[in-house]
Amino acid sequence: WVRLKNMVTRQRFDWLSMDESRPLPVSIPSMPLSLKIILVGERESLADFQEMEPELAAQAIYSEYEDTLQFADADTLKAWCQWVWQNAQQLELPGPAADAWPLLIDEGTRYTGDQETLPLSPLWITRQLREAAAFCEGEEITGEAMQTMLARRVWREGYLAERMQDEILQEQILIETEGECVGQINALSVIEFPGHPRAFGEPSRISCVVHIGDGEFIDVERKAELGGNIHAKGMMIMQAFLMSELELEQQLPFTASLTFEQSYSEVDGDSASMAELCALISALANVPINQSIAITGSVDQFGRVQPVGGLNEKIEGFFTICQQRGLTGKQGVIIPAANVRHLSLSHELRQAVADNQFAIWAIDDITEALPMLTQLMWDGEGQTLRQTIQERIAQATQQETRHRFPWPLRWLGGTSSN
């Protein structure tokens, strides 16, 4: 490496003996050499190189390979199709027929997680073509062959997801998809196992209970050292929104406890903060939440809903449970509006939505989710959740005052003040 580095920096080739103990019999002058080195690797590897050879790295011309393509018009989509055909010809594999392209594009957008982005990775393209070619009888991959390949892949890689679903269906993990419950909500999470090629989603039951106390919000996951830092941050943001909205002049007279039920591993991320906030509001207002609806998304301190990852897996995980138990037409999921562009759902789920058997609601603010879950507005005219919570706070404060001072002392205090 030292000799190669000298050749690159000096742009000359020196004749040296392979054996340092035996020099060349004659001295040969160095020769001019036009040499370039192309280093290809991930950012972590390039960072190591930059640390080891800062002078050489400073002279390098840096560039990046794009592994995805954003298509906004027909020309870009046509260029991507040509790229797929080029890979098929190089590998001597059949290319997609006209009816196979929509399925391949759907799979591509699902892989990238964006409806307007397709993968450029030759490895990804090769895998799709090779697996589909096994079900192809002609010179082109038909839509039927592509569909068969995708279905077989889901079946091959779906064992763990099916076992987790069985735990819920056999009521070993308690998830309700009908009825109402105070302080309980179905959140959505993504499960990834090392060495397993497919992530899958499943609902998680979040519960919240409140009682008279000093205003503490207890994060059970954090107390049990099962909650990560990002989850803790989401909890604090959620609390800040609620305290700001209630406009309290004194400390909240309730203590609340929030937890992921039947969760025995570390929980991290803020994608459940909107669900936790809804459960907290339900418990404070003593208003039940519709268990037919699951929810995912994070919130900021102003109650605005922010996008999260793993959306397709989350929705499909809850849909599968509802489907196995029987679709009622009232079940669905609430997602951030910013996540709509990331939807790339299975054909079965899309058909259920089209038949009004399952619903997907996209929202921008937490106040849009609360009426769907509790049948009450957060704020406005008539009976609202905010008003209900404030009334319960006032009642709790009065009870606390009565317990603190016996009635004769209260009477004396009232007389002296007059």
State each model region's role:
Residues 40-43, 50, 70-78, 94-98, ...:
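Ordered, soluble secondary-structure elements with a strong preference for glycine-centered loop motifs
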Residues 1-12:
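Conserved P-loop NTPase nucleotide-binding/switch module
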Residues 42, 61-72, 82-92, 109-118, ...:
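Short hinge/gating elements
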Residues 50-51, 57-58, 62-123, 138-140, ...:
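Conserved C-terminal "switch" segment of AAA+ ATPases
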Residues 10-75, 90-91, 324, 339-342:
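Canonical AAA+ ATPase core
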Residues 2-4, 20-24, 141-143, 211-224, ...:
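Peripheral, non-AAA+ core regions of ATP-driven protein-machinery
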Residues 2, 24, 32, 45-48, ...:
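Phosphate-handling catalytic cores of nucleic-acid transaction enzymes
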Residues 92-96, 109-177, 380-381, 400-403:
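C-terminal helical "lid" subdomain and adjoining coupling/linker elements of P-loop NTPases
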